[in-house]
Amino acid sequence: MARQFVVLVLLTLTIATAFAADAPSASPKKSPSPTAAPTKAPTATTKAPSAPTKAPAAAPKSSSASSPKASSPAAEGPVPEDDYSASSPSDSAEAPTVSSPPAPTPDSTSAADGPSDGPTAESPKSGAVTTAKFSVVGTVATVGFFFFSF
């Protein structure tokens, strides 16, 4: 009777260890996608204030502002907040320039979400197969241990 108890305890520990080893491998796969998406979002957010700085600089000097427009954003670092408010009326003149940086931001986010959805859908299938394998192996091992412990 004591041998059966020891065998049962060892079997339980073995299966618990196998499940514990399988569970952490699924968690890190889910974590990088959300981590990658916020990393991309602030980068795009940093680019977005630069674009509104270009639009207001071009609005007052619309005819001869091609070269100064490029130099103005570099010179006007702390002023983008004021320029951003002023860019609303002149947004129609530079709409393609301002619209371009926000467009890649949603694309990058959706691209990050797309691959994360794919592996997430595959992970439960792999987990279900792994669980089924553990169930079959555990049942066979239990029957074998009890059979040989008598």
From Swiss-Prot:
Residues 19-131 are annotated as: Disordered. Expressed in the anthers. Residues 1-20 form the signal peptide. The keyword Transmembrane does not apply. Residues 19-75, 85-98 have a biased composition (Low complexity). One of its GO terms (biological process) is pollen tube growth. It is found in: Cell membrane. The keyword Iron does not apply. Belongs to the classical AGP family. This is Classical arabinogalactan protein 6. It comes from Arabidopsis thaliana. The lineage of its organism: Eukaryota, Viridiplantae, Streptophyta, Embryophyta, Tracheophyta.
